[in-house]
C-alpha cells in the first residue's frame, strides 16, 4: 500500500476509534458514575502507554517534564472527567459535535496565548468546520430541546483543554518523539 493510501486508511481507523468513544462513554455511564468512568479511561490509557512507551521515558529531559505534565493534565485528565459528566445530561452526538470546536479553539488560543502563526488555508478550514459545527448544533438543539445544554459548556471546556494541549506540544515539545510525549 502506498504511503498516501496508508495515511487515509489510518485516518479512517482513527476516526472510527475516536468517534465511537462518545457512544462508549454514554454506554459506560449506565453502570458507572462519571468519576469512575473518567478514572477508568485514564487508567487504561496510562497502562497501555506505559507498556508501549516505557523505554522512551528516559529520553525526556527534566525541563520537558513540566510541559509533559501540563499536556497530560489538559490533554487527558481534565477532558476525561468533563466528557463523562457532560454526557449524563446531553447526547453523545451533541458531545462529539461540540468536540469538533477543538480546531477553532486551537487556532484562537495558538494565536492569542502562544504567539503561533497559522496559514490562510488552515484558517479557512477552521471557518468551514465552524459553520458545519454550528449547523449541526442548531439542528440538535431543535430536535432535542429536553436536554440540559448547560452541560454542553463542559464539552466546550474540554475542547479548550485539548486546544491548550495541542498548542503546548507545538510550542514546547515539537522536537520530541510523539511516543515520549504521550507516555
Residue ranges, per PLM feature:
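Membrane-interface helix-boundary motifs at transmembrane edges
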Residues: 56-63, 112-121, 143, 167-180
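Specific transmembrane alpha-helical segments of multi-pass solute transporters/efflux pumps
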Residues: 16-22, 50-99, 135
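Cytoplasmic-side transmembrane-helix entry/capping segments in multi-pass membrane proteins
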Residues: 11-12, 63-73, 118-131, 151-152, ...
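Juxtamembrane C-cap of transmembrane helices in multi-pass membrane transport proteins
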Residues: 21-32, 44, 80-90, 98, ...
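Specific alpha-helical transmembrane segments that line the substrate/conduction pathway
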Residues: 36-47, 83-117, 122-123, 158
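Transmembrane alpha-helices of multi-pass small-molecule transport proteins
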Residues: 31-78, 105-109, 161-165, 182-183
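Hydrophobic transmembrane alpha-helices of multi-pass small-molecule transport proteins
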Residues: 49, 69, 109, 118-140, ...
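Glycine-/small-residue-enriched transmembrane alpha-helix faces in small-molecule transporters
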Residues: 1-36, 144-171
Amino acid at each position: 500500500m502506498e504511503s498516501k493510501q496508508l495515511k487515509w486508511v489510518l485516518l479512517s481507523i482513527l476516526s472510527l476509534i475516536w468517534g465511537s468513544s462518545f457512544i462508549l462513554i454514554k454506554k459506560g455511564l449506565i453502570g458507572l458514575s462519571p468519576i469512575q468512568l473518567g478514572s477508568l479511561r485514564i487508567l487504561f490509557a496510562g497502562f497501555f502507554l506505559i507498556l508501549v512507551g516505557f523505554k522512551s521515558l528516559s529520553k525526556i529531559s527534566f525541563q520537558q517534564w513540566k510541559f509533559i505534565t501540563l499536556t497530560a493534565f489538559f490533554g487527558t485528565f481534565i477532558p476525561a472527567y468533563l466528557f463523562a459528566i457532560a454526557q449524563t445530561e446531553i447526547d453523545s452526538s451533541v458531545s462529539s459535535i461540540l468536540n469538533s470546536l477543538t480546531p477553532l479553539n486551537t487556532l484562537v488560543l495558538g494565536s492569542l496565548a502562544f504567539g503561533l502563526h497559522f496559514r490562510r488555508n488552515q484558517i479557512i478550514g477552521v471557518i468551514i468546520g465552524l459553520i458545519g459545527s454550528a449547523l449541526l448544533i442548531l439542528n440538535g438543539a431543535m430536535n432535542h430541546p429536553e436536554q440540559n445544554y448547560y452541560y454542553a459548556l463542559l464539552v466546550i471546556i474540554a475542547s479548550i483543554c485539548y486546544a491548550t494541549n495541542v498548542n503546548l506540544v507545538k510550542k514546547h515539545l515539537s522536537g520530541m518523539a510523539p511516543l515520549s510525549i504521550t507516555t
